[in-house]
C-alpha cells in the first residue's frame, strides 16, 4: 500500500461515526433522528411524523404505510456531514414486530444510541434490543427523552439502567427541572448551563442561552428551588458516581447519559457534539481471514439489507452495503464471495432515506447503495484483493405463522415476484410445507404487523390482493444437523415439519412445552431457535 493511500484511509476512518438508534415504540426515535439531521444541516425544517397532512412526513419514514401510520417499519440510512465528521445514522424500525430488520442493521453499526422515555424508563423492546447490542459489545449512548413532560426522577432512571442492564452510568449532562418547569440542562463537560427557548414544535435549531454555573444571574434565571436542587444533584453524582471511562464505554460496559427533549430540541446538539467525541470510530470486523482492520488496503464490505421499490417510479431494488475496509470507488470491479463472480459496481449511491445521489468514493463505516438485479442476498460479502467472507447474519425465531393465499390465478406471476422480492429483502421469513400438494408459502413472522405489511406491499407495489390463513403454531426450531438427523429419529409427535427458504428442515410447535417434550423423547436430536447463518447461500427458487 502506498503511503498516500495509507494516510488517506487513516484520515477518512478517523472522521467517520456510524450508529443505530434503538428504542421502544413511541419513545421518540423518529423525532430524535430528524432533530439530529436538523442540527447536522441535512434538513432545514423537521417534519414531525404525526404532523397535519398538509405538512410533510418524517424524512426517515418513506414507505407509504409508514407515513399513513406514523411508525417506522423499515430500516433506512441517513448520511450527513457535521463539524468535519461523516455521520452514518442507521434508522431502525421502532415497532416491535420488526426486530429482525433491527438486528440486521445493528450488524452494520459501530455504536448504538438507546432512547429512553423519561416517564416510562426501560421498556420491553429496549431491553430486547439492548441484548442484541450486548452480544456485539457495541458502545451504548443513552438519551433520556421527553424531559419537557412529567417523568421519573433522573436518579431513579440511572439506577434502573444500572440494575437491569448491568451498565455503569455516567451523566454527561443533567436536567434542570422537568415537565412544565423544565429549564434546560447542565453540561458537565464544560460546566455550563444551557437554558433553552422553545421553538415552534422544534422545527428549527433551538436558540440557547449558555451561562456558567458560577454566574451571579443564574439564581435569577432559575427558580430558587431548581437552582438548589441542581447543586444538590451535582454534588451527589460527582461525589458518588464513577468517572467517565471511555475504554469501558467502547467495550459496552459503561453508558454515557444525556437528558433532553427531541420534540423541542432540548439537549440534542449537546448530545451530538459529545457523541462525536466519545463514539467508537469504524472498528475491525471478523472474517474468514481473521479480523479485518478498517484501514486495510483492499476494499471489502457486506450486504446487511435489501430493499425493493424504494422509488415506486422505478421499481428498483437496492442492496445496502456496510463498507468494512479499504476505499470504495465508483466503477470498481469486486469479487462476489458467494458466487465467485466478478461484478462491476457502476452505479453506487449515497443514501438518504428514499433519496439517492451518485457516489464516487466511500470508506469504512459508510453505507452505500448498490443496484441489485437479483445478484445480492443478505449476508453477502464483496471484496477486492485476497478472498474473504464476513460472518453471516442469523435470523430471529418467528412466533406467528400463516399461509399466504393468492385468490386470483391471473396474478400468479406478480404474486410469485412479490413474495420472492419481499423474502430477499427480509421483510418476512418464508417457509413451505413438505407436502408437495401444498404450494402456498407460509409466512413466518415475529409479530402480526409483518403480515399486514406483506399484504399491503403486495397490493400497493405488485397489484396483488392476498388472504392470510393463520396457523396454530408459536415456536419454530431448526434441525441443526439437517434432514438426515430428522429422518434418523423417525416420526415426531406434536410437531409439523416444514422447510425454510434454503430448503432446511424446521419443526413448528404449538407451544414451548411441545418443543421440550420432543427433545426429551429424542435426546440425540439437536434443535436451534436461531436459523443457521445464511452467508454463502442463495434461497431456493420459489
Swiss-Prot record:
InterPro entries referenced in this protein's UniProt entry, alphabetically: EF-G-like_DII, EFG_III/V, G_TR_CS, P-loop_NTPase, PrfC, RF3_C, RF3_dom_3_sf, RF3_GTP-bd
Taxon lineage: Bacteria, Bacillati, Cyanobacteriota, Cyanophyceae, Gomontiellales
Keyword Lyase attributed: no
Location(s) in or outside the cell: Cytoplasm
Gene expressing this chain: prfC
Keywords for this protein: Cytoplasm, GTP-binding, Nucleotide-binding, Protein biosynthesis
tr-type G domain location: 14-283
Name the UniProt record assigns to this protein: Peptide chain release factor 3
HAMAP family in the record: Rel_fac_3
Source organism (scientific name): Cyanothece sp. (strain PCC 7425 / ATCC 29141)
Amino acid at each position: 500500500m502506498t503511503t498516500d493511500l495509507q494516510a488517506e484511509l487513516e484520515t477518512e476512518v478517523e472522521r467517520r461515526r456510524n450508529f443505530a438508534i434503538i428504542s421502544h415504540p413511541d419513545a421518540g426515535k423518529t423525532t430524535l433522528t430528524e432533530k439530529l439531521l436538523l442540527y447536522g444541516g441535512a434538513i432545514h425544517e423537521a417534519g414531525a411524523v404525526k404532523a397535519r397532512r398538509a405538512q410533510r412526513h418524517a424524512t426517515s419514514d418513506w414507505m407509504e404505510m409508514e407515513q399513513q401510520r406514523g411508525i417506522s417499519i423499515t430500516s433506512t440510512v441517513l448520511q450527513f456531514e457535521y463539524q468535519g465528521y461523516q455521520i452514518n445514522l442507521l434508522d431502525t424500525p421502532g415497532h416491535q414486530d420488526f426486530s429482525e430488520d433491527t438486528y440486521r442493521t445493528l450488524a452494520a453499526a459501530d455504536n448504538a444510541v438507546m432512547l429512553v422515555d423519561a416517564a416510562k424508563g426501560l421498556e420491553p423492546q429496549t431491553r430486547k434490543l439492548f441484548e442484541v447490542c450486548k452480544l456485539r459489545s457495541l458502545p451504548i449512548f443513552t438519551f433520556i427523552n421527553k424531559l419537557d413532560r412529567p417523568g421519573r426522577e433522573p436518579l431513579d432512571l440511572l439506577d434502573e439502567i444500572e440494575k437491569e442492564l448491568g451498565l455503569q452510568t455516567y451523566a454527561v449532562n443533567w436536567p434542570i427541572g422537568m415537565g412544565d418547569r423544565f429549564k434546560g440542562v447542565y453540561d458537565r463537560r464544560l460546566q455550563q448551563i444551557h437554558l433553552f427557548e422553545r421553538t415552534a414544535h422544534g422545527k428549527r435549531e433551538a436558540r440557547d442561552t449558555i451561562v456558567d454555573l458560577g454566574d451571579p444571574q443564574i439564581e435569577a434565571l432559575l427558580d430558587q428551588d431548581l437552582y438548589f436542587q441542581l447543586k444538590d444533584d451535582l454534588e451527589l453524582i460527582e461525589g458518588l458516581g464513577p468517572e467517565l471511562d471511555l475504554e469501558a464505554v467502547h467495550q459496552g460496559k459503561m453508558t454515557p447519559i444525556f437528558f433532553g427533549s427531541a420534540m423541542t430540541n432540548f439537549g440534542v446538539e449537546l448530545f451530538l457534539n459529545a457523541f462525536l467525541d466519545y463514539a467508537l470510530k469504524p472498528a475491525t470486523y471478523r472474517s474468514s481471514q481473521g479480523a479485518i482492520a478498517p484501514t486495510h488496503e483492499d476494499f471489502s464490505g457486506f450486504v446487511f439489507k435489501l430493499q425493493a421499490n424504494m422509488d415506486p417510479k422505478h421499481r428498483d431494488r437496492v442492496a445496502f452495503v456496510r463498507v468494512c475496509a479499504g476505499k470504495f470507488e465508483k466503477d470498481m470491479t469486486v469479487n462476489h464471495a458467494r458466487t465467485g463472480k466478478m461484478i462491476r459496481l457502476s452505479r453506487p449511491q449515497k443514501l438518504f432515506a428514499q433519496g439517492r445521489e451518485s457516489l464516487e468514493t466511500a470508506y469504512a463505516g459508510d453505507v452505500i447503495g448498490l443496484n441489485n438485479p437479483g445478484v445480492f442476498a443478505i449476508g453477502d460479502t464483496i471484496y477486492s484483493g485476497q478472498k474473504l467472507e464476513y460472518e453471516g447474519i442469523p435470523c430471529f425465531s418467528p412466533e406467528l405463522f400463516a399461509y399466504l393465499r393468492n385468490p386470483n390465478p391471473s396474478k400468479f406471476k406478480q404474486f410469485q415476484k412479490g413474495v420472492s422480492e419481499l423474502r430477499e429483502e427480509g421483510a418476512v421469513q418464508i417457509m413451505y410445507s413438505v407436502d408437495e400438494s401444498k404450494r402456498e408459502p407460509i409466512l413466518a413472522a415475529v409479530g402480526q404487523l409483518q403480515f399486514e405489511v406483506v399484504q399491503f406491499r403486495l397490493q400497493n407495489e405488485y397489484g396483488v390482493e392476498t388472504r392470510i390463513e393463520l396457523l396454530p403454531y408459536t415456536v419454530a426450531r431448526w434441525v441443526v444437523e439437517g434432514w438426515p438427523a430428522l429422518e434418523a429419529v423417525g416420526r415426531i409427535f406434536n410437531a409439523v415439519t416444514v422447510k425454510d427458504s434454503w430448503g432446511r428442515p424446521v419443526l413448528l410447535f404449538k407451544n414451548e412445552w411441545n418443543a421440550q417434550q420432543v427433545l426429551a423423547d429424542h435426546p440425540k436430536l439437536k434443535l436451534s431457535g436461531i436459523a443457521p447463518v445464511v452467508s454463502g447461500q442463495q434461497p431456493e427458487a420459489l
